[in-house]
Amino acid sequence: MSFQTIFDIQQSMAVNNRRMVGQQVARSGYITVAQYLTAVPWVFTIQPHAYLYYPQVRDIIQTIDNKDRQLPEQISFASTNLQWFVKMRGTATAATLNGAPAANTQTLALNSNGTFKAGDFIMVSGYVYKITADSAGSSVSIHRPLIGTPASGTTVFLGTACTFNVVAESCPTYTLNPMTDGAFVQWDSAFVFREYIT
C-alpha cells in the first residue's frame, strides 16, 4: 500500500505515455519521422506531499524502503481524490473481447453495452490502454500495441476498474526536519514509477 499512498496524497503528477518516435532533418530541410514498435510503458512522475508527520507515516516509508526499486505494486485511481484521471466519459459499463485479437494490434473488437470516448481508459489482461477516438462500442482504437495474447471473451475493465502495475524507477531519499515530538518528512526529489511489463 506504500506507493498507492504516495499517489493518493501527491502534490502533482506528470504522465508519460508517448510512443518512441525518431526524427531526422536533412540538410535540404525535409524531415523524416519513424515510430518504433515498443510496449509504450506508462511512466508517472509523482511529486510527493511535503511535510508529512514522520511518526504517522514511518510505516509507509518502511514499506517504500522494503519495495525500493525492485518490487512492483498495483496502483488504482479509483479513490475520490484520483478518479477524475480514469473516469469513463463514454456510456459503456461492461465489455469483453469479441474474438482473439492479432498480435500487436491497435484495434480491438468488443462486445460492450455502450460507447467509448477518446481518452477513456480500458484494461485488457492486466495492461491499461487509452481509447484514441470516439467509438460506438463494437470496435475501439488504442494508443499502443496490444501486449500479450488475450483470448476471445476476455473481460475488458473500464475506467476506475483499471489498475497500473508499476515499479519505482526512482525512489527519493528524505530529510527529517525536527519539530515538537517528531519531525516533518521532506523528500529530496520526485518518485518516478514505470509500468512493469512482464
Feature-to-residue mapping (PLM):
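Oligomerization/assembly interface segments of phage tail-like spikes and tubes
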Residues: 33-54, 178-198
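Short solvent-exposed strand/turn elements
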Residues: 137-163, 187-198
